[in-house]
Amino acid sequence: NIIDNFGCEGAGLKLNITQDDVDETIKTFLKDMIPPSILVNNAGVTDDALLLRMKDFQWDRVIDTNLKGAFLVTKSLLRSMLKEKHGRIIFITSVVAELGNFGQGNYSASKAGIEGLSKSLAREVSSRDITVNCVAPGFIETEMTKVLPDDVKLRMAENIPMKKFGKPEDVANAVRFLASEQAGYITGTVLNVNGGMAMP
């Protein structure tokens, strides 16, 4: 329905990005389609706990989805981009990749790992007109943050120089820019969308 609403041609694919058969599934799906030239890695989960209380499965679930999943999908779609000598790869990371966050050792590690993966890949493929960048959101107004008590949201906003949460459109605009031809000479960078929470 989303594709039809925008008057575009395309199709959707639902898959578990943590499984090793991702490559074969994507190949089969794209067999009769024009290979995509833009990849946005935005799948992610959280499973919070203090490190001493964190179970192995909590660590593995977050790392497998957020980091390994991004690796598997990127590797699968990279071949066609290299063949076409053009592509845009964008990873969604987080402000916690730089700042860390209480009870989110697994999530912070996965997002920091993505930033390292992105910069390494940028060095490998940028000579083929494939750019690789990250967008790192801070606190964004989502269904998850809407349920927080107002006093909690106010305290969180106090730590943001702009004194407010971002909107999903702020993240989407950053992704749209990095996917565009206007960003053709930008690679290996992290575009912070966090209202000034983290200033490298």
PLM region descriptions:
Residues 79, 123-127, 184:
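Alpha-helical segment proximal to the catalytic Tyr-Lys
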Residues 126, 131, 186-188, 194:
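Short, small/polar-rich loop/turn modules that mediate ligand/substrate recognition or access, typified
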Residues 54, 100-108, 120, 148:
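Active-site loop-to-helix junction immediately N-terminal to the catalytic Tyr of the SDR YXXXK motif
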Residues 94:
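Residue(s) in the substrate-gating loop at a strand-loop-helix junction
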